[in-house]
Amino acid sequence: MKTEIHIGNLIKEKLRQQERSNAWLARKLFMDSSNVSKMLKKQYIDTEILLRISLILEEDFFSYYSYLYNSTINSSSGKEK
């Protein structure tokens, strides 16, 4: 299954919308800002950290994966009919 979700980019976009910086997020996560910057360049992020980011930014980033999963399941079941 190929995914086109780049979770780091989605988080960066949400930070931009909220007019927040990587340094702000780093402080909230109790992480070094350079580590946060590196993390946001990645397509995948550890689920525990993603949960913390979701809570901090008040955005369910897991829903992007749920949507992709449901779309895949629905298109697969449509092919079997």
What name fits each language-model region?
Residues 1-20:
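A short, Lys/Arg-rich alpha-helix, primarily the initiator
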Residues 13, 19, 65-81:
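Short, charged recognition helix plus adjacent turn
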Residues 14, 28, 39, 67:
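Residues in the recognition helix of alpha-helical DNA-binding motifs
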Residues 18, 29, 56-57:
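Core residues of bacterial helix-turn-helix
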Residues 24-26:
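Short alpha-helical "recognition helix" segments of helix-turn-helix
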Residues 30-45:
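Recognition helix of helix-turn-helix/homeodomain-like DNA-binding domains
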Residues 42-55:
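Short, basic-rich loop-to-helix N-cap that marks the start of a DNA-contacting helix
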